[in-house]
Design a protein with these regions (language model features):
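Extracytoplasmic gate region of multi-pass secondary transporters
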Residues: 57-62, 268-315, 383
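Hydrophobic core of transmembrane alpha-helices in multi-pass small-molecule transporters
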Residues: 51, 118, 132-160, 278, ...
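C-terminal transmembrane helical hairpin of 12-TM major facilitator-type secondary transporters
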Residues: 339-382
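Transmembrane alpha-helices of Major Facilitator/SLC transporters
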Residues: 88-92, 289, 310-334, 345-352, ...
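Glycine-rich segments within core transmembrane alpha-helices of 12-TM secondary carriers
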Residues: 81-89, 153, 157, 176-206, ...
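C-terminal ends and interior cores of transmembrane alpha-helices
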Residues: 113-139, 347-363, 416
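Helix-to-loop junctions at the C-terminal end of transmembrane segments
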Residues: 90-104, 205-206, 323-338, 422-424
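Intracellular juxtamembrane helix-capping segments at the cytosolic ends
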Residues: 60-62, 66, 158-174, 291, ...
């Protein structure tokens, strides 16, 4: 009888323990779902602000080269983009210290104004159209103004994007099972800016002219600055102590900030990721100027003068494919191995390169839409995955986002400078350079995957 009572008591205690564990599990799932919904709302507001900014700025990166060429400023567009990404690279070293000193919304707002100045420089250029090339309208003055504002934009871009990585990382850390969904959600909105931006560009360039294009985009950029200023704080009540600790931290000297970024190079995981981050930048630098080349090759003599408008039609599909890929890759990232997905994304770059070469041979305008779709998939997929990998493998480390943006911007600067130096060579030369970096990136990701698999077995 006593034995039966003891067994009953043990069963009751076991059931009670299981019941408590079940309740704790349900409570944890419920809390994570609440954090996910809160985080989703905040990321939605951040995404809309970024989408508005890059609706204004994004189309400029692809069209600016062609637009400035219409005024016989042959390399001005590519040089300004190079100035942006070159300064972006080295400003990334100190971005963490600046973000640490101010609130996210202040950093976002001030950084936004750098983009506004860069866009507004286009107003100055086209105000000088038809006037004597002297004073502030001289060639030297125009090159100086455009490149100065481009460099300012690069400095602001470093703080904007490192802050973006930190903001999203904080929100996604409260619901790790939905990390990929939240980051993919952001980049799908970013890609939507291409659709809106190029539809807007085609309307403005066709019916209102170049001056109106830069003027309205400057206004849109200021609107996004206000949207960023009213953003909510990313910290939830559950992790409010993180915010307090962050504010108490002292800003480290510049030398130490640079060391914090470079010390990551001793980490094998970070070291093998750098070629991948570099490739993402090369992709941006390549299609930002190459889409214009492919489209121009497909046009006849009468259509060439309207090349920027034809480019704007094509890049709408680049944005559409980016939106879809941003959503899809976010969902896949929460279910599958991130490195395998990244390897697949680098192989997608090869497909885009092959069809880009085909576009130069066939010279068919309809094929340019497929080429744009492929480059849009490459850009959105790889941009999303690089942030998800940095956020998952290096949680809470803003310096990893600095290293990521350093590699991105150097890769983009390299592609842009190659675009300038290889202008007298056949346009497919730049594609072979991209292909070379794609191979290196794929090999490094495969080695990193092998190392991780070995660690897991041990």
């Amino acid at each position: 009888m006593a034995q039966q009572e003891l067994e009953l008591q043990e069963n009751f205690l076991n059931k009670d323990t299981e019941y408590n564990q079940l309740n704790n599990s349900k409570s944890q799932i419920l809390n994570e779902e609440i954090e996910y919904q809160i985080g989703k709302q905040k990321i939605f507001r951040l995404s809309i602000a970024f989408m508005t900014l890059f609706t204004a700025y994004g189309s400029c990166t692809s069209l600016i080269s062609g637009l400035y060429k219409t005024l016989n400023f042959t390399n001005l567009g590519l040089m300004s983009l190079f100035s942006t990404y070159f300064t972006f690279a080295f400003a990334s070293f100190v971005a963490k210290g600046i973000i640490q000193k101010f609130s996210f919304r202040v950093v976002f707002t001030i950084s936004n104004l750098g983009y506004t100045a860069c866009i507004a420089a286009g107003i100055w250029v086209f105000m000088c159209e038809g006037s004597e090339q002297s004073g502030f309208c001289s060639v030297e003055a125009i090159y100086s103004i455009v490149n100065f504002t481009a460099a300012l934009c690069g400095i602001c871009a470093s703080t904007l994007w490192v802050a973006q990585g930190g903001y999203v990382d904080i929100l996604s850390s409260t619901c790790p099972s939905k990390r990929g969904v939240l980051i993919g959600y952001f980049f799908s909105f970013m890609s939507a800016s291409n659709i809106i931006g190029y539809i807007l560009a085609s309307i403005l360039l066709n019916f209102f002219g170049n001056m109106s294009y830069f003027l309205l985009n400057s206004v849109l950029s200021l609107v996004s600055a206000y949207m960023m200023y009213v953003l909510p704080d990313p910290y939830s009540p559950n992790i409010k102590s993180q915010n307090d600790n962050r504010n108490k931290q002292q800003i480290k000297p510049l030398k130490e900030q640079i060391k914090e970024v470079l010390v990551l190079l001793k980490d094998k995981k970070a070291l093998y990721l750098i070629p991948y981050y570099w490739l993402v930048g090369v992709i941006l630098g390549c299609y930002a100027s190459y889409i214009f080349v492919v489209v121009k090759y497909s046009l006849n003599e009468e259509q060439v003068q309207y090349a920027p408008q034809y480019v704007s039609y094509v890049v709408i599909f680049l944005g559409l494919s980016g939106v879809i890929c941003g959503i899809v890759v976010g969902k896949l990232a929460d279910k599958y191995n991130l490195l395998i997905l990244a390897i697949g994304a680098t192989l997608l770059v090869t497909t885009a390169i092959i069809f880009s070469l085909l576009g130069l041979i066939v010279k068919e305008y309809a094929l340019c839409f497929l080429i744009a779709i492929l480059w849009g998939c490459c850009d959105s997929t790889n941009s999303s995955l690089q942030v998800i990998i940095a956020s998952k493998d290096f949680p809470g480390q803003l310096q990893m986002f600095s290293l990521q943006k350093l590699a991105n911007s150097l890769g983009c600067s390299f592609a842009l400078i190659m675009g300038i130096l290889l202008q007298s060579y056949p346009p497919y030369c730049i594609l072979f350079i991209v292909f070379l970096f794609q191979i290196i990136s794929t090999i490094c990701l495969a080695v990193l995957l092998s190392l991780k698999n070995t660690e897991n077995k041990v």
